[in-house]
């Protein structure tokens, strides 16, 4: 059964280093902690430059959803700037990552435990169609405007930063309708 996750139900947890906060969107298994999850999807708001936490054995994807840019230095050598031109990055969770920001940014964050599952993150556009590729799929509205997601007998009205978690019992084909073009982040989770 599809689970609608409205933005107003997300709660921010401040980082220990004081450089930002995280709002967990979904986690599996439900109620798992940072050491037990198979996968975790969240929004991270970065307010100050500093290091990321290390997550050994975890594969991560980040996509910039708000703010101008964030410059990431991985393992002291590889520099990547997340911006509108290059909004997404995949990296291993054990990498030493240093973030440099000039203003507040918000990143969509997907983490999967490497020995249990994997993920694929892509940006799609509504209006359009979605053919699911996995038993668990999460849709996140990153753009402005509203999106009506319809699959089988179900339909959900989604606004900016709302999410919809689809499981194996939900339709494989979905229609995403919108009055204006809107960016939708689609996460396929493979277990």
Model regions and ranges:
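Jelly-roll (double-stranded beta-helix
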Residues: 1-191
